[in-house]
Amino acid sequence: LQKMLFPTGDSVSELDALRKAYKEALASVDAARDAVSKAGEDQEKQKAAEEGVQRAETAASEAKEKLDEKRKAKRPDTEAIAAAMVRNSGDPDEDKRQREVADARLAACLAEHEDNPFTLPASGSMLGMLTERVACKDKLLACQLDAILHAEAFQELEAVWRGLHYLVFNTETSDRLKLRLFNASFKELRTDLERAVEFDQSLLFKRVYEEEYGTFGGEPYSCLLHVHEYGLSAVDLGVLQKMAEVAAAAHTPLLSAASPQLFGLGSFTDLPLPRDLHKIFQSADYIEWRSFREKDDSRYVTLCLPHLLMRLPYGNDTDPVETFVYEEDVAGPSPDRYLWGNAAFALAACITAAFAKYGWTAAIRGYEGGGAVENLNVYKYRQTNGETVALCPTEVSITDRREKELSDLGFIALIYRKNSDKAAFFSGQTVHKPPVYTSDTANANARISARLPYLLNASRFAHYVKANMRDKVGSFMTADNVSKYLNNWISQYVLLSDDAGDDIKARYPLREARVDVSEDPGNPGAYKCVIFLRPHFQLEELTASIRLVAELPPPAV
């Protein structure tokens, strides 16, 4: 095979020698030209140097011609080699003969397209050399693919679509549970909301409110998921405030995410560093943010954090690529090269799971209460000391103390369960900051109205009352008739027992309910309706204490 690939008898060493001679001739040309520049005004030296340049250029030209001739001579005729290999084989084994023909053709192809001289590998197999060449190309392709996958713009796009994939495949859609996708960039959404004179003149309001909640036969939305991370900029706060107005008008809670910049951080991996988060939010930079939290519409806004690992890095041991060998370069624990997504997708999946199981959406928090997020992507890598560690699939592990701080500040944190592939939402706090009253009852009502599980259920009652009473328009019903009708209807969702199990309470979300209907004095035939709802309270926190005594005291009354 070696002789057939080099029909002129030239060896690889001869071709290397010609290539080396050509490089030396080029170096001589450069040296001769330097001598001309150094000759100065001495005519004799300058003339001698110019003659040296001519000789060097001539020698270089001759060396190049010889090298080109040898290169052409070593390029074999592919078909001739293949035919010769088959004809001269003499081996009846068809597989072996075809192998020899394939080796010859591959060798000819490589010799024709590569500048380097062709040499057989130590094994003598041409397919082995081809494998080495393919591996080299795979490495080059992997570098290019790493640059694409780790580009910030591409990561944002991939994270959105993988988050949507996660939500769809973790939702039991049916005729009672539907997902709708509204494709619009943040810039388009901002333009729509800012150009509208009032929020109810925007296209978003028409899509969310008028076309469904405000239309006879429409299907009001239970909640909205906006795939964006809100920071502290004036643009983000302006859009968030207008989104809250739309959500409040349609009684449709808005789910979204908080950006690390909202906390003054570069990434959520730095979240454990600040000693006191409350102190950060009391600075002058957060004046507009604090003002937004005090508005009633902010109770319809929920911001989640930190992030979810949307996929494992590509690789043979994690997520193999079928078309070629690819090991994604993620550089250990550095978070920038991993694909992080919006945690609001996980909260939305908890909401749809609760509705599919119970028909209501109160059971969305707590590890055993419907807030568990399972089957997270856990990536394990080896450190320089040889120890195998797991990357936190929620980007950062949040302690109980920090989770309480975040909840008090109006955020819902996804808490990772150590040494597992599970996490859970324990808080149900919306962005709204409950006002403080002098009455304990008023303070309790304010805190309840700022929690997402209760708000989701209350919003659905508001949707039903409007849709159902719209059907009664034109009928001969008095205020007492309307009140009796609505109280009978709402009583079917009331469970008076406090000792019932969690599953029963999830199906009957109200502990008490009452509907008051009164006539509008200035508008005959029009009634005003006020609905009072008392949900089954969920465990928020538990303070435990231990006392060591020699004698047990009597139980406290």
What are these regions (language model features)?
Residues Y213-P393:
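Extended, regular secondary-structure scaffolds
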Residues L1-G9, R75-K187, D192-E194:
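N-terminal-proximal low-complexity accessory segments that begin disordered
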Residues L140, Q144, V160-L167, V246, ...:
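Generic, well-ordered alpha-helical scaffold segments in large soluble proteins
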Residues N481-A506:
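Short, hydrophobic/π-rich interface segment
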Residues R514-V557:
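C-terminal edge-of-domain segments
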